[in-house]
From Swiss-Prot:
Gene behind this protein: FAM216A
UniProt xrefs under Pfam families: FAM216B
Domain of life of the organism encoding this protein: Eukaryota
Family the UniProt entry places it in: Belongs to the FAM216 family.
Residue stretches in coiled coil: none
Disulphide bridges: none
Annotated protein name in UniProt: Protein FAM216A
Annotated stretches, region: Disordered: 1-47
Length: 273
């Protein structure tokens, strides 16, 4: 037992006395041997913290950049707000050469006020207002049914569309009114002679209606109506020429009558105004 204990004690004393192999050296070795995993752990942890810190730094830099952009935008807005915003007004040369614009003691507010007054008295602005008023009056007058120009345009279009008919405009209205009954009769009868085109009121030299002429006088053109067909049959060239001359005379008389009516309506309008 003593022999077994003595070597342990001797070994322990020798280990304590030997420099570099004592418990201190053993502790240092253990600490050095235990140091690398700790260091490795710290290095790993340091790498993670470094990545996190880099992420935080990038976010912070982005925030700084955004804040700088916002601040620069606010600064630009403040500069624009401080600078006076004057409205551009186009003035004539004679207005710009006026003496009150060249006065050296005028402030910006006074110049702006003078420019607004000059805009009111500008010729282009007045022309635009006059043109707008004129267009408004024209539109308002064209909507009225009794306007002379509108009535004349309707009459001229009606004459241009119905020149081949040997009758006046008021007779076309009768034909339109009787067109429904004539269409119904055309279904039963294959051919039917239109009676409205074969009679015409007689006019004397003064253009006054005296009565109705006979049917033999107006037989220059015969208009037959068939289902889905409308054609004209000429009787003789002499009769057609006489009818054309008569139609021209009637048109001239009607135009003179319309001109006299327009003059009378203008006089009544002037009296009312």
């Amino acid at each position: 037992m003593l022999g077994q204990l003595l070597p342990h004690t001797a070994r322990g004393l020798g280990a304590a006395e030997m420099p570099g192999q004592g418990p201190g050296s053993d502790w240092t070795e253990r600490s050095s041997s235990a140091e690398p995993p700790a260091v490795a752990g710290t290095e790993g942890g340091g790498g993670g913290s470094a990545g996190y810190s880099c992420y935080q730094n990038s976010k912070g830099s982005d925030r700084i950049k955004d804040g700088y952009k916002v601040n620069s935008h606010i600064a630009k807005l403040q500069e624009l707000w401080k600078t006076p915003q004057n409205q551009t007004i186009h003035l004539s040369k004679s207005m710009m050469e006026a003496s009150f614009f060249k006065h050296p003691d005028l402030t910006t507010g006074q110049k702006r006020y003078l420019c607004s007054i000059a805009k009111i008295y500008n010729a282009n602005y007045l022309k635009m207002l006059m043109k707008r008023q004129y267009m408004h009056v024209l539109q308002h007058s064209s909507q009225k049914p009794g306007v002379l120009t509108h009535h004349r345009s309707r009459l001229s279009s009606r004459y241009s569309q119905k020149q081949h008919y040997p009758c006046t405009t008021w007779r076309h209205q009768l034909e339109r009114e009787d067109s429904g009954s004539s269409d119904i009769a055309a279904a039963s009868a294959p051919e039917m002679l239109i009676q409205h085109s074969l009679w015409r009121p007689v006019r004397n030299k003064e253009g006054i209606k005296t009565g109705y002429a006979s049917k033999t006088r107006c037989k220059s053109l015969k208009i037959f109506r068939r289902p889905r067909k409308l054609f004209m049959q000429t009787v003789s060239s002499d009769d057609s020429e006489s009818h054309m001359s008569e139609e021209k005379k009637e048109e001239d008389l009607l135009n003179n009558f319309m001109q006299s009516m327009s003059i009378e309506e203008q006089g009544e309008h002037l009296m009312l105004t």
